[in-house]
Design a protein with these regions (language model features):
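...captures the hydrophobic TM-helix bundle architecture rather than a specific catalytic motif
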Residues: 1-3
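Soluble extramembrane regions of membrane proteins in the secretory/endomembrane system
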Residues: 6-195
């Protein structure tokens, strides 16, 4: 039975890239050898707080489609992942962590348009003037790297100042700003890792 399993578990390659095989490639990270799939999953969890990226959702007029295209039509406002009533009959296309990592490394211009950066603190949203844009998912807000890029240096400086405080002494705003800055730095490291 174990000899037959590999023959039965062949997967079909779509879109020219075998993301499952890519995910099995070993990399040295933090002094340990890990498969790229683990790097992708852990990175996506740190950045987005989830392991898969929804590619589709609702526009302001409840039009269903590609989130980035809907964002362009509506100036980034009024986007949601899916309403409760849609949960039972609309399943958004989602990007597997390894597919996302391949995009980040090989097609960064495409990856920069994915809504992965989570910001939930109202004061931070107001400071960055992002409260009316992004994608809403049950009260959580997600943004693209394109939307976050103007704030990279500001958040990096904030992280340096906040990092001097003990983690237990940080207020919710500082924790949110620190986490967002870390997510942006991690994304940038991944984005330029093959260059």
């Amino acid at each position: 039975l174990f000899a037959i399993k590999p023959l039965l578990s062949k997967h079909e390659v779509k879109d020219g890239f075998d993301h499952l095989a890519f995910g099995k490639l070993p990399v040295l990270l933090g002094g340990r050898i890990k498969p790229l799939d683990s790097v992708a999953r852990n990175s996506l969890l740190q950045i987005a707080g989830q392991q898969r990226i929804a590619l589709e959702g609702n526009g302001p007029d409840k039009e269903w489609g590609d989130l980035y295209e809907l964002s362009k039509k509506a100036d980034g406002t009024g986007l949601t992942y899916q309403s409760f009533s849609q949960k039972f009959h609309k399943r958004p296309k989602k990007l597997h962590p390894t597919q996302w990592l391949m995009e980040v490394m090989m097609e960064p211009d495409v990856a920069d348009k994915r809504f992965i950066f989570q910001i939930n603190h109202p004061e931070l949203l107001t400071e960055l003037q992002l409260e009316n844009v992004g994608v809403d998912k049950s009260g959580l807000r997600f943004y693209t790297f394109e939307q976050m890029q103007p704030f990279v240096m500001l958040l990096h400086k904030k992280k340096q100042v906040i990092g001097q405080k003990d983690a237990a002494e940080r207020n919710p705003y500082e924790r949110a700003a620190f986490k967002l800055a870390h997510a942006l730095e991690l994304y940038i490291q991944l984005r330029y890792s093959l260059q």
